[in-house]
Amino acid sequence: MVPKADSGAFLLLFLLVLTVTEPLRPELRCNPGQFACHGGTIQCIPLPWQCDGWPTCEDKSDEADCPVTGEARPYGKETVDLRQGRARGGDPTHFHTVNVAQPVRFSSFLGKCPSGWHHYEGTASCYRVYLSGENYWDAAQTCQRVNGSLATFSTDQELRFVLAQEWDQPERSFGWKDQRKLWVGYQYVITGRNHSLEGRWEVAFKGSPEVFLPPDPIFASAMSENDNVFCAQLQCFHFPTLRHHDLHSWHAESCSEKSSFLCKRSQTCVDIKDNVVDEGFYFTPKGDDPCLSCTCHRGEPEMCVAALCERPQGCQQYRKDPKECCKFMCLDPDGSSLFDSMASGMRLVVSCISSFLILSLLLFMVHRLAQRRRERIESLIGANLHHFNLGRRIPGFDYGPDGFGTGLTPLHLSDDGEGGTFHFHDPPPPYTAYKYPDMDQPDDPPPPYEASINPDSVFYDPADDDAFEPVEASLPAPRDGGIEGALPRHLDQPLPPAETSLADLEDSTDSSSALLVPPDPAQSGSTPATEAPPGGGRLPRASLNTVV
């Protein structure tokens, strides 16, 4: 039974197929003017790199099914003069490769001239037009300050190259119209003034390479008869049709006139930041490959090494940054950027939550450690009070200041019990029975219980034996006066009444903490000290039970 289109089974089957099926590789989309490699990490290369004799794609698909033309010349790292094979007036683009790291290409678009200069591959020279009006000699000094001179020409191709260039620059124009006149490096010397002016062209500055000389010039309308040397002006046209047909003329003008001028200098190494590089230094040539590193040799980049960058992940259309190596700009539609922003937001939220949880855990650990420390101190204080039994005094213990060494000092919460007032053992682990520490027994144990309640036992001072004697073992027989007549009359305190129970006597004895001494017989006025008790003998000594 085939499930219906709107059934849940069909939907689950469709989702299962989408999950199991391997996603197809997105179609490569290269910009116009680029060749799409069939495979590998390199997907798009410039179209002129196809069939140039050197494979660029990893699968060498750019060199497949290519006719052999011989126009592309691969060169190795060996001693190769990069100027070999150059023909003046020919194709200015050449491809050179170096067997170091990745293949490298050289062409006329690589910066060999500073900004504002036009490079001509035929003579390896750079040209620039200065539109500021100066006389001939000032113009020559300006060209010398930029390591050049007023332009001269060695071939017709070089002259055509200069005439075909667009010299419009953001500078103040001097007398700019559809035609222009430029000071160049020639001078016309007058040799005779018979029927007409006769003379010849000469190079204004000695030391210039072999050049061709212009044809007969057009003289200025106003000429001084005293002038024997005139300076050359090249007249060219700004209109594109006339310029492309190489229309020009030569004029002999007074050297004091002000005009624009054309400077010429040898090509030089220029880095990607438009800085001139000296001979023998490493630099990144000016161009569209910021990952190229070369050595400057005779104004050209040689011994170059290029870095191969990995294509950006998650981006189908991208463009290289012309100023920074291995930096790309994604050209995908805005949809991917929306997902990227959402992913960035989710990462930010997850980071905030993780940071909050970690901080909370740290705070809880600090609080728990402080709580355990407080509980430990409280347990130490409670154990101290329990061991010393400050609420009730124990019989037989000495509570004087020397009883415990330094006495009892209050234990504060700041005292952790280590090296402070008291010395305690570490607290026991949790969930175990607490073991009380061993206590040292006193040297003099307390008297037994029977001795403490025996009325016959007395404490006496041996030094008082001369004045007192111990009481006889048996009490005298009572007389008519009863028990009170049998007791010595010099004692102030009477005995406890007969009806007092033994338990009350024990309680009174336990609560007593002072040693009672007999009063001074001299202070008693009721009975004379010389009165002898009945029965004869010495005066009996007063005795009371003393219990600590």
From Swiss-Prot:
Residues 415-548 are annotated as: Disordered. This is Integral membrane protein DGCR2/IDD. CDD domains: CLECT_DGCR2_like, LDLa. Disulfide bonds join C30-C44, C37-C57, C51-C66, C143-C263, C236-C255. The chain crosses the membrane at residues 348-366. The gene is Dgcr2. One of its GO terms (biological process) is response to xenobiotic stimulus. Glycans are attached at N147, N194. GO terms for cellular component: membrane. Residues 25-347 are extracellular. It comes from Mus musculus (Mouse).
